[in-house]
C-alpha cells in the first residue's frame, strides 16, 4: 500500500487541550463559590432534621439544623441561601405566608442570626401555605385569581423584608407581581431589598421531588400560570416585563432543560441572570450515580458549568455547599 501524504496541519486545536494546566489557563467558564445559592427547607413543628426521600442529601430543617447548614454554606463561600417554609396549618388563602411569626419569617431570622453577612433570599409564593397547593388564591371557578393574589404577595414580601431578608424571590408567575411587590417594599421603607424575579418559570415535570420537600397539597397543575415548555419567545416577553417593573435579577427555572432560554435571557438582560437547577435535575443525577450509571462529581460539575456557560451569573443548586468545598480544594 502506497504511503499517504498529508499536507502539514497548521491549525491544531488539540494543542490547547494537551495538559491540565493549559486547559485551566484557557477555560472560558469558571465556577466560583460565590456564584452558588443554597436552597433550604424549614418545616414548622419538626423536632429533628428529616432527609427528603426523593432528594437524597437534601433535608427538611429545624432551627438548629438550618443554622448549622447556613454556617457550613458561609464557611464554604457560598453566595447566598434561599429559604422555603412549610407551615403546620394551611388555609385557602395561605395566610401563614404573611404571619410575622410564621415558619418562613422565623427561618429568615434564624439564618440572619447564624450568618449576618450572608445574603438571605426568601421565596415569595403561596403554594406552600395554601390548602390547595396553588401559588395564589382561587376564584369561584377554581382558577387562580391573579389580581386577588397580588396584594397577598405584597403583604408577604413586607413581612419577610421586616424579618431580615436581603433579597426576595417572587416565584408565583402572577402577572404584575414585581411592580406590586416593589411598590409595597418601597412604601414600607425597604428600598434596598433586592428582587430576584422568577421571570421564566416553566410548568415542568422536573419539579416533582420539590413537592415532597414542601409537603405540597397541590390539586391539579399550574399550567395556566407557569410557562409552556414548548415556548421560548414568551420568556423574553416575561423578562422584559419584569425588568420594566423593577426586577434586580431575572431567573430561568428549571436550568438544565432550558439552557437555550437561559442564553437568550442573558442576551437581552442588563441585570444579573440566575438559573435554578431544580429538584428533578438534582435527583436524576443523584439516583443515576447511586446506580453506578455515571460519575457523580464529574456530572455535577459538568451540569453546573453548562448552566454558567449558558449565561447564568448566579446558580441556585442543592449542591451549593458541596461544590463550593470542591472548588476551594482545587484552589488550595
Curated annotation (Swiss-Prot):
Q: Identify the species of origin.
A: Propionibacterium freudenreichii subsp. freudenreichii
Gene Ontology BP terms: protoporphyrinogen IX biosynthetic process
What protein name applies here?
Delta-aminolevulinic acid dehydratase
Supply one GO molecular-function term: porphobilinogen synthase activity
**Catalytic activity annotated for this protein?**
2 5-aminolevulinate = porphobilinogen + 2 H2O + H(+)
The organism's lineage is: Bacteria, Bacillati, Actinomycetota, Actinomycetes, Propionibacteriales
Q: Which PANTHER family does UniProt cross-reference here?
A: DELTA-AMINOLEVULINIC ACID DEHYDRATASE
User: Where along the chain is 5-aminolevulinate 1 bound?
Assistant: 211, 222
Q: Which SUPFAM superfamilies match?
A: Aldolase
Binding site residues for Mg(2+): 238
Q: Which family does it belong to?
A: Belongs to the ALAD family.
Its keywords, alphabetically, are: Heme biosynthesis, Lyase, Magnesium, Metal-binding, Porphyrin biosynthesis
